[in-house]
Amino acid sequence: LRDFSEAIQLGLNSYIEKYPMLNEVSRFTLNTDVKVQATQPGEGYHEWHCEQDGLSRSERLLLCMIYLNDVDEGGETEFLNQHLRIRPKCGRLVICPAFWTHFHRGNPPINGVKYMINGWMEFVDD
């Protein structure tokens, strides 16, 4: 978890350089309740979704994903409004807003298992 947190912090620093107004929102931190996923060939989260889909997840600000292996065919994380597919590569970090602007889905790997870690930057009470 420490390596994941360190990688997220480095990526977040770059993200804030690109979007400096992020420093103007309420205080936030990495939720340590991360999710390790192993997606088998033909599986995936096929439904379009966003990470903040109502009051039950209203504390989520950013989605943070790190791919733990390369996937040669399929397995992309696809973003609807951005018309973007991100191929899993070991160590690749993806950070995006948790909001409705970034609906996404996990396309199924064709062969081989896709491994990744998901975490969320969340608003915290002062």
Set out the residue ranges of the language-model regions.
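Fe(II)/2-oxoglutarate oxygenase catalytic core
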Residues: 1-93, 101-126
